[in-house]
Amino acid sequence: GIVNTNTKVTIDGKTFLHRVYGGGFGDPFSTGNNETGKIGGNTEVYIQGANIYGDVFGGGAGVAPKDINGTYTYFTNVAKVSGTTKVEISGEAKIYGNVYGGGDIANIKSYITLTGSAKEAYYNTKPKSESKLDQTTGKFLSYEAKDYTTFVNITGGDIFGEVFGGGKGLMKADAPDYQKVGRINGNTLV
C-alpha cells in the first residue's frame, strides 16, 4: 500500500530480531516500477530503550533492480519517502546492526535538475543543528535541526555497527545504473 502522509515508529523496551524501517516495504515480486510502500510525507523512527538485532532505517525497504530479458528495471518509486526522514537513538537502546538515515535501496525524495538561481539557493541552504544548554548548570535544554533531508540524532544508547546519514545502496556490480536506487536527493545531517 501507500501512505499519503507521515509515519512515526517508536520502540521503547522491546526486542526486535529483524530490521526496523520508518518507511514502507516494497513488493519483491514486482516486475515494473510502482509506488508500493511509498510514503507521501515524512518518516520518524525513535528507539529509546530497545534491543534491535538488525539494521535501523529512516526510509523504506526497496526492491533491487531486475534484469528482465536483458533490460534492467529500476524500482525508483518503490518504498520511496517523498519528504524527510529522522532517526533518533536514545536512552538505553542497543542496536546490534547499522543505523541509516535513508532507506534500504529505497530513495528519499525525487531527483531533480536545478539551474540558475534555484540551483544557487539549493546549494547555499545547508542543514543546521543547534543545541541549547543552560549556561549556569550545563544542563541540556533543547535541540533543533532544520533544512535536512535525512537526519540521524544519537543522544544515548549503544550502537554496535556503523552509522550513516544516507541509505544503503547497491554495489556497482549489482546493476549498470546502480546509483538510481538508494539515493538521498538532498542533504544529510548526523
Language model features by range: what are they?
Residues G1-R19, G24-D55, A61-V190:
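Surface-exposed loop/turn motifs in large extracellular/passenger domains
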